[in-house]
């Protein structure tokens, strides 16, 4: 959901700074939704980077595609895909953005986290905003190690 209030208190750039994405990175945004973070993330990684904005809902994919076109971004690929089967190459992603995506009944962690682990590069980062009990589940999975928390974003390194 996009609103002036959300931008004021939790703007996309502030959240993205917490994820520490860098120019030139390949970033996967899971559950891009309305594209609240998409344009800012693409701008932060620059022309040498690549952002894969993924959502399972075609309405969101269409909406984000229009935002990307309007912003004239060439470094974004918007895809309609289930995040438990991304279709991405193994170890191809520097950072996965999971902003208010989990928990979800359509993304059981025992199936979802292994796919995120598979696509992340060996030193890749999983950047998450969610509830504390979900963060504990990520730690307990053994697939990711907690490294930092900044601007409400918990960052995990691929184990």
Residue ranges and their predicted role:
Residues 94-108:
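A short SAM/SAH-binding and catalytic strip from SAM-dependent methyltransferases
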Residues 123-130:
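Conserved beta-strand signature within the Rossmann-like core of class I S-adenosyl-L-methionine
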Residues 72-83:
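Conserved SAM-binding strand-loop segment of SAM-dependent methyltransferases
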Residues 84-96:
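A short acidic, Gly/Pro-enriched loop at the edge of an enzyme's catalytic core
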Residues 6-23:
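Conserved alpha-helix/loop element of class I SAM-dependent methyltransferases that forms part
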């Amino acid at each position: 959901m996009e609103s002036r209030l959300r931008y004021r208190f939790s703007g996309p750039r502030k959240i993205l700074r917490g994820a520490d994405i860098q120019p030139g990175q390949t970033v996967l945004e899971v559950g891009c939704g309305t594209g609240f973070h998409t344009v800012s993330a693409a701008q932060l990684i620059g022309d040498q980077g690549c952002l894969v904005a993924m959502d399972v809902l075609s309405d969101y994919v269409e909406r984000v595609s229009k935002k990307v076109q309007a912003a004239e971004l060439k470094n974004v690929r918007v895809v309609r895909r289930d995040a438990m089967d991304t279709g991405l190459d193994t170890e191809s992603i520097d950072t996965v953005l999971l902003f208010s995506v989990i928990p979800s009944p359509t993304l059981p962690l025992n199936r979802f986290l292994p796919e995120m682990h598979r696509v992340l590069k060996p030193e890749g980062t999983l950047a998450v905003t969610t509830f504390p009990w979900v963060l504990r589940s990520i730690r307990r999975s053994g697939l990711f190690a907690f490294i930092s928390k900044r601007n409400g974003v918990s960052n995990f390194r691929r184990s």
